[in-house]
Amino acid sequence: MSAPLPIETNELPHRYTAAYANAMEVKWQDALRWPDGNGYGHRQPNPGEPGFDGSKPKFYCLDMFPYPSGAGLHVGHPEGYTATDIICRFKKLKGFNVLHPMGWDAFGLPAEQYAIQTGVHPEVTTKKAIDNFRRQLRRFGFMYDWSREFATIDPGYYKWTQWIWLLAYESWFDPSTKRARPISELAERFARDDAEFATEGGSRTRWSAATPRERQAHLDTFRLAYIGEQTVNWCPKLGTVLANEEVIDGRSERGGHPVRRMPLRQWMFRITAYADRLLDDLALVDWPESTRTLQTDWIGRSDGAEIHFAVEGEREPLTVFTTRPDTLFGATYMVVAPEHPLVTRAVARDAGGKLAEYVAWAKNRSDIDRQASKEKTGCATGLLAVNPATGARIPVWTADYVLMGYGTGAIMAVPAHDGRDFEFATEFALPIVQVVEIDGARFTGECATSGEGRAVNSANAATLSIDGLFTTEAKTKVIAWLESKSIGTHRVNYRLRDWLFSRQRYWGEPFPIVYDALGNHYPITTAALPLTLPPLADYSPVESDTPQPPLAKATAWTHTTAGAAGVDSSLLPAHTPVVRETNTMPGWAGSCWYYLRYCSPSDASHFVSPEAERYWMLSRRGGGSHETPTTYDAATCHAGGVDLYVGGSEHAVLHLLYARFWHKMLFDLGHVSTPEPMGRLFHQGMITSYAYQRADKSLVAVDEVTERSEGEFVETKTGERVVQTVAKMSKSLRNVVNPDDVIAEYGADTFLLYEMYMGPLEASKPWNTRDIIGVFRFLQRAWRLAVDERTGALLAAAQSDPKIEKLLHRTIHKVAEDIERLSMNTAIAALIELVNAATRPTGMADPTQGGMTRDQLDRFARILWPFAPHIADELGARLGVQGVGFYASTWPACDAALLVDDEVEIPVQIQGKIKARLMVSAKATAPEIEATALAHAEVVAAIAGRPVKKIIVVAGRMVNIVV
């Protein structure tokens, strides 16, 4: 295809200018547009569909899909998208079936907050934002399969989000197999064994004698999706629960309103059941080490012991978890969280006293404030515990630095060897006893010494002595002693908490669950899905002392009957009045599984077509047969389904951890083929922008700064000197660069090339529009290699230059290797080197005497295509490529013989300093290299007649002469 382009009305009408580039790009995007108008370019059929070629290997590449904000994309957003587009085009040329989809993560709090501020419904603003994002992405020319596009707010999508949630609700984690199983199997086991269990009231009953509510409550303690009570940050004024990060000194970050801590029953996910697998299976995937570390730390597996301390006057012991049971002899006091039941009972005995006052104050502090506070606060409970190793009576305190959500909510304090315990003991004059002697760290009593060492002061007259033992051996001996006395046991603990999955907001997926008058919960059937979000004119939060989600206002929707709601009649008679759940799912819900829906987005019968999922997600290691395996085999198959997942490192923990959890549950229950969702993960760096900083480190908006001279900037209003720095692009700093503006000035191909040429993909780097001109000029030179700027005719050398041919082969090889490594900047550098070498001398009368031949230009255009597709397609059309661009083309082959240098440069060192450089044959032997070196004029001058003691020759590398 070679339709005419607009002619520039100057002496070089076919010069590659911004206007020429823009017209060319739009032309090719229009040419590639599908007949239905819904996309352009690449449409990848699934197995069984017309056009599918099962003989090809598959490549599934995925971008972390964007949250479409009203501001649109800035130049930082397309960085990862550009890299994935390059590798997808490369893989297509290499003969792969390529799946590269795009969609929209559209539910969530930002859209709802924007809607409340503007008075425009979030559905309206979100769809408008999606339209703008889609327009921008299409203008880049990315090779997305737009036939697979969806948004998480589409009812046809969130129907299956609700279905997966119901799957979790109807499942439990079997610790014996470490796999999820249907909850119905567990209920059958309880019925068969007539299992005895404790009711919520504390009494014990058997399954056969239990009421339906008691049975349900017992099963709820096993479900993967369950109702649990969590202490939350409730802001009555804002009418919502706030994250810990949104609370500062007991007030909301937004508005400064009072926040109080209160228990709230909410839907949870039992992600902690998967802690070991989430941790261990990180070894199965090709992920950045930094991300593995972040997830490892977040899960926080720690090995230690649970120890039971008797408490005077209490029936039940006080249980603590410690990773250092070897320090038991140094426990001189106990600390429990203000929310601990032991404290609750103590407060009841001390109503209105100092303890009650302290507990009320501490409970209203967020977990982050409690952990971050440098000042140690606490209050004695009046209770005494008994140290089982020493027999000493030790006081029990409550303090806000101990959290109920971690471990048992209680600690044994060993102030000699823990910094926080030492500060607390110093503040309240509590005993400090050294029990570990650490090499190189003498205990002076002025600060804690932490680490491993040998036990001291750790023996009792009864049965336990660990004095002189190193930490590892001492821990083992203490645990054995605890177990022999039935006062403790070995335990593995986790920092990971169960996942709070309820939100008191409107703009999210409704829960497919209802409640009867007694508060029993019932799932709705799959046939009743999707449970759609009702239209609501007033979706603002309700100001209240108790949480009332916005959906509670939709009374016609919330109050219904079991039959109308879609509850199975075997669970509840159809006429029974029920109330729908009014909380909604968090923004994470839709992003936990979207990569699976892309495999078959139009399948109305399955959340993902089993055949399509198996093809795109399951593959063998090491290439070979392209036939899709029928089942996962750990010995031969990749553990992760998506071949390449690219996105920001800010999602290294939560999104990726939640997606892995959902995927493992689906794997256990037979719905997906691999144990991990993502095989290879890559985090692109952030593209920042220039900002300006005052002397006090505060930032000044870009448009409030004047440049006086090169590198000197002042604040326009005050004349104060400011320093240029880099910062994240933001509206407040007015340093956001809109890609629409850059494309208008230079074209999309230049924009894409510059994004990749700025530096390593994984590195953060500042955007500078001034620097983009270099990349634009490179494309101009590439264009002039093939096109006469006056006539538009094809320019090609009559004969091949062997040096250019050799360099072309080396470039083909290097660019391919660099793309696989996602080293796009070095690949572009190789392309620039090739173009510079092939560029004709200025004023050459006969262009056929220089440049590249027609065949060389064709190969060059094909390796340029992944990086600058529009100009490459235009060059291809002028070279006679049939069809629409290079979509049906192949990656050019390279001759291995031409990748080897005929000559190599070898440095010659004399007395350790380089004195000369030799150009010798790559096949030269050591004696030949030695003779050449000794005959070199610069070497002769450096030796200056001195006797040569030794010559060391490393063939192909260096010569070292000692005189």
Task: Identify what each model region corresponds to.
Residues 1-35, 46-54, 337-340, 349-352, ...:
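Basic, alpha-helical terminal appendages of large translation-related enzymes
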Residues 2, 11-62, 92-101, 125-131, ...:
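Conserved oxyanion/phosphate-binding beta-strand-loop segments in alpha/beta enzyme cores
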Residues 2-21, 25-40, 117-318, 325, ...:
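Residue patterns forming the tRNA-binding/recognition surfaces of aminoacyl-tRNA synthetases
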Residues 15-19, 120, 124, 301-306, ...:
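Long, charged, mostly alpha-helical binding arms that flank functional sites
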Residues 47-122, 126, 150-161, 322-323, ...:
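N-terminal catalytic cores of NTP/NDP-binding nucleotidyl/phosphoryl-transfer enzymes
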Residues 84-85, 97, 340-444, 452, ...:
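Catalytic alpha/beta core of large soluble enzyme barrels
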Residues 105, 176-180, 221, 226-233, ...:
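Helix-rich, typically C-terminal accessory recognition domains appended to large enzymatic cores
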Residues 290-319, 363-392, 396, 499, ...:
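Flexible, glycine/threonine-enriched loop-and-boundary segments that flank and lead into catalytic domains
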